[in-house]
């Protein structure tokens, strides 16, 4: 009989002295985020150069997650709190991400010369095919905020075969009317560009409260070295055309859509109206309580949870585990309609602040989340 030999097994990822498993997990997450700095590229388009940053590697038979930020922000200030959130890591490990910066909004961007003709929002949408062609990506799941949500919606109308799903936060699909235009001009006489943009991003209650978050973003926008560029993007947003969505008509989004807005947010009415114009069997409406004007900044955990369910409804991440938010609330989720061959689905959720449970509701209703 062969002599038995003693084998010493070493822990693959030993803990540091005094380090708890939770602290080790947080350190590992921080290290992974620090190491993945992304690769930044620029590509020429018919309307000028556009810069974008790619994180991760393409996954076979999976779309890329492509983001587009709002006015006054770039991809980092708009999306970093969301995509660096711990529970989001399970999602981003399964998808390559492309974060697009509007022209002149990227870090270190030079100020455009006087008289520069900034692209319209429609033209910004027409830049996206150049990005996808450069990367050789065929389909995307778009995540946009404010002006970025409009741009992705316009792109989806023009290129429906390349968009598998959309998460549209604070979208206003309507052109400014005469009353809106007059109010904007009047506000411009008494308010600075940074203050007008802050009023676009955050609710009046948030601005009056002057929280640490508001102070941070007021400082970012007020002292932005490319403030002249930001004003050009702002002007393009205010001169947007109507998307002309029509429920049951030819002009509509043909992919699954999740509309998101904060309760009492500046764009709440616009998002509610947008929801009324889209196909209810393809659209989920998430109204988030206590999230203010930028839910991806203030409530990344809740938005991550909703995004995960959205992806599961499209047929991705079916075996995904529940996040801490759901586990802690022993939540249950049921789909209002099963996924068909085209991954079409309609799902509505409501979350009660009293019971703290998720439940399904009839199609077309609001998904309200409050904790």
From Swiss-Prot:
Residues 1-21, 334-371 are annotated as: Disordered. One of its GO terms (biological process) is nervous system development. Keywords: Acetylation, Cell projection, Cytoplasm, Developmental protein, Differentiation, Neurogenesis, Phosphoprotein, Tumor suppressor, Wnt signaling pathway. The modification Phosphothreonine is found at residues 20, 330, 334, 348, 357. The keyword GTP-binding does not apply. The modification Phosphoserine is found at residues 326, 328, 332, 335, 338, 344, 350, 352-353, 355, 370. Belongs to the NDRG family. Interacts with CTNNB1. This is Protein NDRG2. It comes from Pongo abelii (Sumatran orangutan).
């Amino acid at each position: 009989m062969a002599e038995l030999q003693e084998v010493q097994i070493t822990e693959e990822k030993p803990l540091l002295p005094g380090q708890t498993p939770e602290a080790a997990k947080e350190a590992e997450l921080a290290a992974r985020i620090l190491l993945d700095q992304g690769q930044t590229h620029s590509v020429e388009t018919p309307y000028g150069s556009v810069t974008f940053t790619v994180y991760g590697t393409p996954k076979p038979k999976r779309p890329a997650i492509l983001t587009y930020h709002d006015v006054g922000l770039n991809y980092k200030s708009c999306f970093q709190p969301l995509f660096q959130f711990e529970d989001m890591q399970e999602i981003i490990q399964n998808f390559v991400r492309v974060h697009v910066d509007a022209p002149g909004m990227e870090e270190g961007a030079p100020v455009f010369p006087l008289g520069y003709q900034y692209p319209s929002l429609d033209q910004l949408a027409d830049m996206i095919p150049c990005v996808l062609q450069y990367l050789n990506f065929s389909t995307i799941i778009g995540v946009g905020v404010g002006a970025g949500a409009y741009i992705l919606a316009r792109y989806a109308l023009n290129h429906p075969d390349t968009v598998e799903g959309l998460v549209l936060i604070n979208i206003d699909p309507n052109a400014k009317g005469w009353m809106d235009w007059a109010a904007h001009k009047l506000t411009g006489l008494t308010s600075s560009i940074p203050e007008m943009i802050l009023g676009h991003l955050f609710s009046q209650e948030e601005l009056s409260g002057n929280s640490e978050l508001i102070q941070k973003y007021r400082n970012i926008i007020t002292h932005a070295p490319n403030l002249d560029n930001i004003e050009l993007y702002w002007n393009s947003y205010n001169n947007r055309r109507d998307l002309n969505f029509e429920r049951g008509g030819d002009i509509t989004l043909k992919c699954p859509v999740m509309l998101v807005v904060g309760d009492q947010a500046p764009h709440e009415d616009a998002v509610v109206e947008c929801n009324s114009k889209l196909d209810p069997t393809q659209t989920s409406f998430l109204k988030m309580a206590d999230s203010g004007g930028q839910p991806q900044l203030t409530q990344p955990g809740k938005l991550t949870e909703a995004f995960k369910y959205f992806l599961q409804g499209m047929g991705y991440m079916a075996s995904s585990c529940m996040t801490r938010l759901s586990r802690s609330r022993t939540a249950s989720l049921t789909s209002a309609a099963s996924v068909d061959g085209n991954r079409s689905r309609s799902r509505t959720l409501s979350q009660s602040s009293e019971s703290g449970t998720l439940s399904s509701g009839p199609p077309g209703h609001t998904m309200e989340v409050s904790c």
